[in-house]
């Protein structure tokens, strides 16, 4: 397999006053430096992990949930799938000195940004996947901002674990086109997949309701966020470009 797709678009973030890295879809980044990791999400999901003891943080950006990853494919292709993207992020955090049992997660994205998307909601699938995956890995979700209809801009401070999220206008250049392509890909995969056999006389218990998630403070609020929580921030319009 080829080299892992580590984000390389480094810049200086004037709003947060520190160096930053912009993550594109299928990329990830881990660091112990005082940096801001930035990405823009539609139906995609970004998982942000932090080890508060080691001061190490990381972010990924995946496009589809757990199915379809080919072990022989290039890493940049496999990173589009959540199962592989989460495995890579966790392993790279451990290599950097983090401990799995100390990891805390903040998760973002999973929006339904295409009007009329009802039968194939990639955002819902991605959101459900990342919650289930982290529960199985026993990594606690300390904050989340998932689903809805708006794209998001997410900033994550790797060294401290602080995060900020901004809801964007519905039509963001590049995001809408990417979402339409993802919907077509998911539709092709769904129609090509063989129909499962019907299991007769198999009564299933109703699923338990999902646990309540921590509330987060959105942009525009002036009150200070609690330590370690998702902090509201007023990102300038210049940064939305």
UniProtKB/Swiss-Prot annotation:
The keyword Cell membrane does not apply. Pfam families: CheD. The keyword Cell inner membrane does not apply. One of its GO terms (molecular function) is protein-glutamine glutaminase activity. Coiled coil: none annotated. Keywords: Chemotaxis, Hydrolase. Its EC number is 3.5.1.44. InterPro entries: CheD-like_sf (IPR038592), Chemorcpt_Glu_NH3ase_CheD (IPR005659), Cytotoxic_necrot_fac-like_cat (IPR011324). GO terms for biological process: chemotaxis. It catalyses: L-glutaminyl-[protein] + H2O = L-glutamyl-[protein] + NH4(+). Probably deamidates glutamine residues to glutamate on methyl-accepting chemotaxis receptors (MCPs), playing an important role in chemotaxis. Belongs to the CheD family. This is Probable chemoreceptor glutamine deamidase CheD. It comes from Burkholderia lata (strain ATCC 17760 / DSM 23089 / LMG 22485 / NCIMB 9086 / R18194 / 383).
């Amino acid at each position: 397999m080829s080299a892992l797709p580590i984000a390389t678009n480094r810049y200086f973030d004037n709003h947060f006053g520190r160096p930053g890295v912009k993550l594109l879809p299928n990329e990830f980044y881990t660091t112990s430096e005082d940096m801001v990791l930035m990405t823009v999400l539609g139906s995609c999901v970004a998982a942000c992990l932090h080890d508060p003891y080691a001061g190490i943080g990381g972010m990924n950006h995946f496009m589809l949930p757990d199915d379809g990853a080919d072990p022989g494919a290039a890493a940049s292709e496999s990173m589009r799938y959540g199962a592989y993207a989460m495995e890579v992020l966790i392993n790279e955090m451990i290599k950097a000195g983090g401990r799995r049992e100390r990891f805390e997660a903040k998760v973002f994205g999973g929006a339904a940004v295409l009007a009329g998307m009802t039968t194939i909601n990639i955002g819902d699938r991605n959101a459900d996947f990342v919650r289930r995956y982290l529960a199985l890995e026993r990594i606690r979700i300390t904050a989340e901002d998932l689903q809805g209809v708006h794209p998001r801009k997410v900033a994550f401070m790797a060294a401290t674990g602080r995060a900020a999220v901004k809801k964007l206008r519905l039509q963001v250049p590049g995001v809408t086109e990417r979402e339409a392509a993802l919907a077509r890909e998911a539709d092709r995969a769904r129609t090509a997949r063989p129909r499962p056999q019907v299991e007769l006389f198999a009564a299933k218990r109703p699923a338990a309701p999902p646990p309540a998630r921590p509330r987060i403070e959105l942009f525009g609020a002036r009150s200070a966020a609690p330590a370690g929580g998702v902090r509201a921030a007023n990102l300038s319009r210049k940064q939305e470009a």
